[in-house]
Amino acid sequence: MNLKCLFCGILVGLYVEAIEAVNYTPEKISASISLKVPGNESEKYSLDMRQLKNDRSSYLLEPSKGIPMVITQRMEDMNGKLRINVSLTALEDVYFNFSEQLSTGFNHDDCQFYMPGFWYRRNLRSPKEAPSFHTSDSWLVREDRLSAPLTGIYSEKEKSFVTVSRIDNFANEVLSTHREGEIILSGKTSIGFTGFENQNGVATLSFGFPYREAPKSYIRKLTLAPAVEAFQSLKKGETMLLTWEIMENKADDYSDFIRNAWEYSYDTYAPAPVDTPYSIEDMKEVMSRFFVNSLVTGNSLTFNSGIHLRTADCQSNGQAEVGFIGRVLLNAFNAWEYSWQCGREDLKENSMKVFDSYLKNGFTQAGFFKESVNFDRGYEDPVHSIRRQSEGIYAMLHFLAYEKENGRRHPEWEQKMKNMLDILLQLQHADGSFPRKFHDDFTVVDDSGGSTPSATLPLIMGYKYFKDKRYLASAKRTADYLEKVLISKADYFSSTLDANCEDKEASLYAATATYYLSLITKGDEHRHYADLTRKAAYFALSWYYVWDVPFAQGQMLGDIGLKTRGWGNVSVENNHIDVFVFEFASVLQWLSKEYEEPRFAHFAEVISTSMRQLLPHEGHLCGIAKSGFYPEVVQHTNWDYGKNGKGYYNDIFAPGWTVASLWELLTPGLSLIHISEPTRHSLIS
């Protein structure tokens, strides 16, 4: 279908010489406005669209009965997209909520849905306690939940899609007294709502202003709350202008739809790098304070305390985690490398204490890492995860490769890592996947394959380091699984360990895994892996914000000037932003050159600059008690992990992984060094 067919005659041209005007029929679009008198239930009025006599592109939206408002709507073509401009003028003081619904003409059951960074397909990988089709097939959400204020509907049958995007400068937000029901805002907000609804079997885009959420609002991890509808004041004589843009196009499949939608969002909102005062050297110097001030000694393992810390004091605890949110070994390697570059004997000594303790006491009887140990409780988690184990091997292979390049060898560590890689071969299923969780005796606890790409990285690194082709063959089998089960089905899920749902990390890890394979292959095989990398990368990109969410005065993140562009939403279940990126910016830089696509490189720079903003240091602690302990759970919408709400952090955080992620972001080309073997000097300006 084309734009004219979609709207059955919506005017798409303003001038005869541009595009021939056609008759507009209102059957495909409906509008309504709700007005609220304080202390009373709101009253909803449907709006009939009547074309103005002297302007075939403009309409008067007439209510079903008299209201103290004048509402007009103008349609215009914007480079093949339909721009909807709504003007609301108050004849008396009013509190209003305006909404429109656009029928796509698609059968709802034939469709998959998209709200970037929050909703993919039907969210059926998510639990019923989070937004998904398990609860309803129609959802409206506030725009700041999304990495772009956009909703898209893709018809698998028609191989067509329609999106609606809000166009605004998004400058205002206001604190509200309630989180459910009908609420009157105490000031101005820029946040509207967007979503999709099943209207008598037809997939419909719904959008409006100010925000509204239905059938539920999602206010806390695994907590659905009653619906909410906000009403904004419009004083007598005031006019408010609202703008949305409709795009429709063809797409071969859901992945192609996501690519189209991301490129459109990127071009529409044009995120620019964030101007921050911190150079790479500044960032690393401050974050190195975490390496010093979080070190825990006196147990069988020496480690940087990086999980479940309180933002209020950042006091170390006895919890040591090899990968995931602790990243003990990767932080030890980063500190080790930095110590040689900067002549920091303190860091060198501390890192070697970590390595020596894990070499002596950090392995189970079967040869796995003791990946999660709580010395405060005297407890060692008996369940292993392919993700933590893989991330531990990854860190130590970086250490061994760096040492080898500098003329130093560690034969005991080499043997431990070779043994672990051999163990991975035993864990791998016939389809190429790895179980998500398992015991020391190899019995499977969680057979989900969503974490499989985390194993690809150390397998390829192990192949390069030990010259053992079995590891490369195993890595290629993981890619076969990724292609068949995740990438080709556009179904990225369950990579993270603190949620079981659609998540950013699954697509990011898939892109990184196939990127590694493309680096060590040639010809058609190289191109195949590169194509898979690009396809997965678009999904990962869709989680990262291309716009700046507004905050209210009094919300700390807004008061210190946080720009959200370049930060990534986490998952459906965990609706906050964070700095999980690791090597992904390097993947984007590589893709940009590989496919001559400047958007990738430009957005990598947006990510790199934006994620420096919350560096805690003296005079600019950003709500964190200690310098260098980078924040984690950054709450940018009406949701929290358990405490504090929008504009603040959760009270507990894990700087172990945030510091490790930013360190890799600021050390570009890390995998290229140890796989394709150019020097680090050639990769860093």
Per-region residue spans from a language model:
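Hydrophobic h-region of N-terminal signal peptides that target proteins for export
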Residues: 7-18
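Beta-strand/loop-rich accessory regions of lumenal/periplasmic or secreted enzymes
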Residues: 24, 38-40, 59-66, 72-236
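Extended, well-ordered alpha-helical scaffold segments
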Residues: 257-294, 343-361, 405-425, 467-484, ...
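Glycine- and aromatic-rich loop/turn segments at beta-sheet edges
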Residues: 288-320, 360-382, 424-444, 483-501, ...
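Well-ordered alpha-helical scaffold segments within catalytic/enzyme domains
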Residues: 329-345, 391-409, 454-469, 509-525, ...
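Residue-level detector of conserved catalytic or cofactor/ligand-binding positions
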Residues: 671-685
